[in-house]
């Protein structure tokens, strides 16, 4: 579903798209979830060299709030939380695949 209020804030559809996936970490998080499947917090933390716990938690929350990923919490001790990409998030994989290809070739 399109967030018209959010979309109307931008004059350019590229700006609108970047409002969902812009920044250093969001594309990388989406890439891992889109290409490798479900991850737990610790798995993502190990794959994202240099990210702080605070930044990872913030990025995951924003991606979940934007419905690009799902945060599934299991009622157990110790707590278990898994993250997976949504259909909306998968819609960005074509862009990320092109970025990945460009990065390999240049």
Swiss-Prot record:
SUPFAM superfamilies for this protein: Winged helix' DNA-binding domain (SSF46785)
Keywords, alphabetical: DNA-binding, Transcription, Transcription regulation
Molecular-function GO terms, alphabetical: DNA binding
Keyword match Acetylation: no
Keyword Transcription: yes
Residues covered by the HTH hxlR-type domain: 12-106
InterPro entries, per the entry: HTH_HxlR, WH-like_DNA-bd_sf, WH_DNA-bd_sf
General function of this protein: Potential regulator of the malBH genes.
Protein name: Putative regulatory protein MalR
